[in-house]
C-alpha cells in the first residue's frame, strides 16, 4: 500500500507540476489538461496522506 502510494505521489505529482506546451491545434485539450491537473493534485495529496499515516502508525 505504501509503495503504491509513493508511485501515485510521484507520477501524479510530476503531472500536476508539469507545464504543457500547447499549440493552436491542442487548445481544445486545455480543459482536459486543467481537469487532469486538479485530479492529479488530489490524488497526490491523498497518496501523501497515506504515506504520512503509514509512517506514523
From Swiss-Prot:
Keywords: Cell membrane, Membrane, Transmembrane, Transmembrane helix. It is found in: Cell membrane. It is a multi-pass membrane protein. The chain crosses the membrane at residues 2-22, 32-52. The keyword Isomerase does not apply. Its main location: membrane. GO terms for cellular component: plasma membrane. This is SPbeta prophage-derived uncharacterized membrane protein YotH. It comes from Bacillus subtilis (strain 168). The gene is yotH.
Amino acid at each position: 500500500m505504501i509503495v503504491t502510494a509513493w508511485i501515485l505521489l510521484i507520477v501524479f505529482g510530476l503531472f500536476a507540476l508539469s507545464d504543457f506546451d500547447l499549440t493552436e491545434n491542442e487548445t481544445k485539450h486545455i480543459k482536459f489538461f486543467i481537469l487532469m491537473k486538479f485530479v492529479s493534485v488530489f490524488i497526490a495529496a491523498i497518496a501523501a496522506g497515506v504515506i504520512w499515516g503509514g509512517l506514523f502508525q
